[in-house]
């Protein structure tokens, strides 16, 4: 999977201003997908959980939603961190949200149906 394909799946990668961090996050996701045997087509069918067999949400949708929620929460909470001189990085929040569940790509076996 290419960086362009990852950015199409997850437009939130563009929210990471630090190019080096963005590349590292993309590489981590790409490696997890490769090691798990997921390609462009199959990753769209990756389940978010194995415990709920009819779950209507895919892994990709889940990661997008969690990342969007983290971006929104950061926007609301950033002022409190700044007021209290707590260092915080939006880029790290976005990268962490995008990568929070990449382990599933290696834990779940891709099975053609």
Question: Can you annotate each of these PLM segments?
Answer:
Residues 1-113:
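Acidic/His-rich, divalent-metal-binding segments that scaffold phosphate/diphosphate chemistry
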């Amino acid at each position: 999977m290419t960086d362009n394909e990852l950015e199409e799946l997850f437009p939130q990668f563009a929210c990471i201003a630090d190019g080096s961090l963005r590349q590292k996050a993309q590489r981590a996701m790409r490696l997890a997908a490769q090691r798990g045997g997921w390609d462009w087509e199959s990753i769209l069918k990756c389940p978010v959980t194995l415990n709920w067999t009819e779950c209507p949400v895919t892994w990709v949708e889940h990661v997008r939603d969690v990342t969007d929620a983290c971006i929104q929460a950061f926007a609301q909470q950033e002022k409190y961190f700044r007021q209290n001189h707590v260092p915080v990085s939006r880029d790290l929040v976005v990268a962490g949200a995008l990568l929070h569940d990449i382990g599933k790509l290696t834990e779940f076996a891709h099975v053609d149906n």
